[in-house]
From Swiss-Prot:
The name this protein goes by in its record: Nuclear factor of activated T-cells, cytoplasmic 2
Sites bearing Phosphoserine, chain numbering: 23, 53-54, 56, 99, 107, 110, 136, 150, 170, 173-174, 176-177, 179, 182, 215, 219, 223, 238, 245, 257, 270, 276, 278, 282, 328, 365, 757, 759, 761, 860
Post-translational modification: In resting cells, phosphorylated by NFATC-kinase on at least 18 sites in the 99-365 region. Upon cell stimulation, all these sites except Ser-245 are dephosphorylated by calcineurin. Dephosphorylation induces a conformational change that simultaneously exposes an NLS and masks an NES, which results in nuclear localization. Simultaneously, one site among Ser-53; Ser-54 and Ser-56 is phosphorylated; which is required for full transcriptional activity.
Organism, as annotated: Mus musculus (Mouse)
Region: Disordered, residue numbers: 1-29, 203-299, 322-341, 790-812, 841-903
Amino acid sequence: MDVPEPQPDPDGGDGPGHEPGGSPQDELDFSILFDYDYLNPIEEEPIAHKAISSPSGLAYPDDVLDYGLKPCNPLASLSGEPPGRFGEPDSIGFQNFLSPVKPAGASGPSPRIEITPSHELMQAGGALRGRDAGLSPEQPALALAGVAASPRFTLPVPGYEGYREPLCLSPASSGSSASFISDTFSPYTSPCVSPNNAGPDDLCPQFQNIPAHYSPRTSPIMSPRTSLAEDSCLGRHSPVPRPASRSSSPGAKRRHSCAEALVAPLPAASPQRSRSPSPQPSPHVALQDDSIPAGYPPTAGSAVLMDALNTLATDSPCGIPSKIWKTSPDPTPVSTAPSKAGLARHIYPTVEFLGPCEQEERRNSAPESILLVPPTWPKQLVPAIPICSIPVTASLPPLEWPLSNQSGSYELRIEVQPKPHHRAHYETEGSRGAVKAPTGGHPVVQLHGYMENKPLGLQIFIGTADERILKPHAFYQVHRITGKTVTTTSYEKIVGNTKVLEIPLEPKNNMRATIDCAGILKLRNADIELRKGETDIGRKNTRVRLVFRVHVPEPSGRIVSLQAASNPIECSQRSAHELPMVERQDMDSCLVYGGQQMILTGQNFTAESKVVFMEKTTDGQQIWEMEATVDKDKSQPNMLFVEIPEYRNKHIRVPVKVNFYVINGKRKRSQPQHFTYHPVPAIKTEPSDEYEPSLICSPAHGGLGSQPYYPQHPMLAESPSCLVATMAPCQQFRSGLSSPDARYQQQSPAAALYQRSKSLSPGLLGYQQPSLLAAPLGLADAHRSVLVHAGSQGQGQGSTLPHTSSASQQASPVIHYSPTNQQLRGGGHQEFQHIMYCENFGPSSARPGPPPINQGQRLSPGAYPTVIQQQTAPSQRAAKNGPSDQKEALPTGVTVKQEQNLDQTYLDDVNEIIRKEFSGPPSRNQT
């Protein structure tokens, strides 16, 4: 058999396996022609028109001849680097790259070339051993690493976990780690194929000065190749190459371990290997511009390379979505010492690689610079939809954390709410469509206040709708809807065992998105109820909310997280016409006495609908239940008129929160609604519809006692009486005593506004101190009784208060005060003697004789220092005569008058009031 003459090396070198006396098999090794001869220096320029033969002896297609081989000059300056640096493999050999030499011709498919090693090189004990046998003693490890790894300057690319989820097809539907850039299996246009309107020469003009190793290498089907394998990047492997295993990909490509030829202890191991970006930005690879690892020499060649790659990654003319990448705050330099972990130095630990806007960072990963590759998108994206790019160095709040929908100028708002009922579908049945809006469309969400031109990602998940803090629902998850009518791009992902749907928010749409791709999936109750720590019951927890969350990056590096939740959605499989539903209530609180009317608006109300109030403890035990009275005459199918029941405890000191629900039958009840009972304030008020708002006293802010004073609450009165006949404001003065026998002096003249009370005492009387007095009052005589009344201007000798209304005189109570009355001076409240005056009191009421009395005040002689006496006139109460009479009933001015000579008759009147109070039954109009 004639042995052909060995062809000379295209670069003028003999190759590592060419030694004198070498076997013919070594000379016939064609791998030296294909980028695997890197132990000899560059001697001459390659011949562009030289034919290249395949290992089988058949010529490659003609388009291979369109490209010549040129030496790699940009990285030639790396030759001075010591072993173990990134440039060291390039310094010991030459590199080839492809350059277009064919003149521009007819437009057609661009050539795709894969220079692969020979078949013999892949077999253990083949030509590789023969070549290694001829190496010098100081170069065996270097040649071993170089032959199998084809050293080149590359970017680190993670393991296969970053490209696909378990049990899911890769973006290219292939088990091969390199097939994701194949146009045959990838959902995207292959980065290796140039645009149709470009000539063959314009495949990659930016790469004309870059070695061929930086271009994507897509091997033809059934062609052996060396590439990163997705299943063996992190394990310890033998330095001896082993026979390659068959791949499960459709193309039946060979795959070889990236670590089987890269030995960790070898100081000359190849640096990180990666496919570099293609002329079109790849959907899986992005380049970061500031993450050159420490230890890489800042040479001119590296600058040219990085600039070219950055241009490709940033200036993208196509519509493939942009990627995110993570910048480590302190990238770890590549160590030159041998690795102790047994791993190749260029392999990073396994980390999770996140999709667009996904911020779930691996907490335990070491600081590093890595590429973030998004997971597969189930459907092909429409052109020109870039997805947001957010650094993931900062941890984001988990889904269980409650977030506000507004922060600063940003606000996430649900413009169109979903329908209150949506039939969720089970895992074993078909989809029931996306959640719809009451108007017939779909919910709409918009982010307000965002002024940047970068898109963001809107996350959607299903949350709870009960009285507890909003969190992901245990029995329902979001479901991605696809179809011809779906216009919103979306994809699913898992965040903390919760399925999340992510859609883009784009500035061109004013950061507004229509949610037409989100359905609701019902999980099996048994699967969730048997989960450890789960206490909810699936059949009783059928109400959900659509929760929307967005993360807004700020120029300062801070990330603002906003969250908005929709109205409750009933997902029960029962008919929506069976269960009553409360959509609105006109009031959510009242006093413990109840009695007020509440209007409920909703759906599916019937004539038999009942409203039940109940209270539960923190541990879920029911301690109170009361059925409210429903006005069946006024009630409608969508409206109920309910009288609020009285709370079980009328002496509460703090507000109590209870729930109520509408029930149509045994199991047809609405979701619980919230209601609050407030304690009785220090001063109660008349119903607000009987008086003008201008006549209602303002809420008091303090009191002499320890009981709190709550704001004015409208309530139904048991009787129409009031302390003051026309609900005119009453004021109170506080005076203090220095000693029991000292003269009374006005210490702090202040007025107190109070409204209505069944009993007045210093411990219960709330008051405030408005500036009502023109001058302080002085009480000089301790034995002087004071008559305080309202009359015409200039009648009194005290200070005059501001005018209030017209001067019609009506009956009004008279307040007597005498410090000499021993019955009133006794008790522990002697220091707080109160002088009260009332409006709407005529001068004719000041008379020497005892008046006719029809009502009095409950007073304890030893504890209460004030006495209130009311007189009546033939005229009716001003409050009963309408607004016009009410305005006329008020006096023009209020005067505090000090009478100089009062006889004992007034003291007798005081004693008579007390005797009648305690001897006879209380009158109907008593306050």
